[in-house]
Amino acid sequence: YWHKSIGGYHAAKLRRYQEMIDEHIQGEITALYKTLPSVGADLSQVGDTLTPVLNMLNTRYFLIPLQQGKTIPMFNPHALGNAWFVNEVQYVNNANEEIEALHQVNPAHVAVVDKKFQNEVKASAGADSLSTIVLTSYEPNALKYEVNSPKGGTVVFAEIYYPGWRSFIDGEEVRWEKRG
């Protein structure tokens, strides 16, 4: 459980996540493989727009197949991390539009939110350059973050939502919503 996979087989794979694989991830992986001959193993040459959804999912390494069944890990310098502040919230009409909107936005800067959660997720004034969020503890059933933000903001977590999650800030339970 310490190694995360963004697209492998899992008996409990959620339908929405499978839709994300079909709509974005497969195409981004194909684009990556087509680009590799021109950049070698240096993904910093391609910028962060080639694989925005994979970056949003914090894909730190790509396992590139070689001959005779071998693979080589390739570092992704554009992975967004476990959590990050965004500058903008874009509201859409439904969950399908959340997935579609990811074709037009850069998840590093924009969170896409279903309008039915607009009262819970207020658009913030934008990320403060001094704000930080760091994953300090990772267990299968508990993630802990340390946040420092002088003016607050909207944070996106690179996690796949499962029913029953609970969130706490300074020991107090808080409401939160899943996002695209």
Q: How would you label these PLM feature ranges?
A:
Residues Y1-V53, F75-V121, Y161-Y162, E173:
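Extracytoplasmic/lumenal acceptor-recognition loop(s) of multi-pass membrane glycoenzymes
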Residues Y9, L66, H78, K178-G180:
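Residues at the C-termini of beta-strands that transition into short coil/loop
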Residues N58-I64:
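Short, hydrophobic beta-strand segments that form beta-sheet elements in well-ordered domains
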Residues T71-P73:
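Conserved hydrophobic/aromatic beta-strand scaffold that supports enzyme active sites
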Residues R60, G69, H103, A108-G180:
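Active-site-proximal, structured, solvent-exposed surfaces of multi-pass membrane proteins
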